[in-house]
């Protein structure tokens, strides 16, 4: 799952925002919603995101690549530029402890960014996040990553600890997002 393409800083504009998402992605399941850009394909039978007027609602995003069903387990599963931004040390004891939650946090927020851009918005349009953690001790690590994606005023936020997440215990975080993206853009 290593991505060799260079990544832009989290708040940089993307070319994806200027292109309308295809009506039906080539790898979409037969019952995929028409608004499912390839980055936002759901992992089960639900909409990854829905628009209601100027509001865009994202279902919970986890650190699983829907195209390959690969779980992000640590630094090795994200691009090198992201690893450097997150502070990969190269020290086994530190990276094995912090790497999984930092990598999953980055992946989830990057997928949210890509989905919001596919809907015609940017991260500054996200005004509400609901973050689910298997262990609240992970919140400070996630918070560090979230600051990379929201450099200005952060969205309203709810944090919840849960006993388990689907599809496996390797999933450490899930994030729902709501954005205000005017149709007139």
What is each residue range found by the language model?
Residues 8-30:
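Long, intrinsically disordered low-complexity tandem-repeat segments
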Residues 2-10, 29-185:
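Short, polar/acidic, helix-capping and beta-turn segments at strand->helix junctions
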Residues 1-2, 24:
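Short, low-complexity, intrinsically disordered N-terminal peptides in bacterial proteins
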């Amino acid at each position: 799952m290593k991505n060799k393409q260079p990544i832009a800083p989290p708040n940089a504009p993307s070319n994806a925002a200027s292109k309308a998402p295809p009506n039906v992605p080539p790898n979409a399941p037969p019952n995929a919603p028409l608004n499912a850009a390839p980055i936002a394909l759901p992992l089960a039978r639900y909409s990854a995101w829905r628009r209601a007027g100027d509001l865009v609602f994202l279902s919970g995003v986890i650190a699983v690549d829907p195209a390959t069903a690969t779980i992000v387990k640590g630094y090795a599963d994200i691009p090198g530029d992201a690893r450097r931004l997150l502070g990969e040390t190269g020290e086994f004891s530190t990276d094995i402890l912090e790497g999984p939650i930092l990598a999953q946090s980055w992946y989830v927020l990057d997928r949210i960014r890509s989905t919001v851009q596919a809907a015609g918005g940017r991260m500054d349009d996200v005004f509400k996040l609901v973050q689910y953690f298997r262990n609240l001790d992970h919140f400070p690590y996630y918070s560090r990553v979230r600051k990379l994606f929201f450099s200005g005023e952060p969205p309203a936020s709810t944090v919840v600890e849960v006993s388990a997440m689907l599809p496996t215990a390797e999933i450490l975080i899930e994030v729902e997002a709501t954005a205000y993206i005017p149709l007139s853009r």
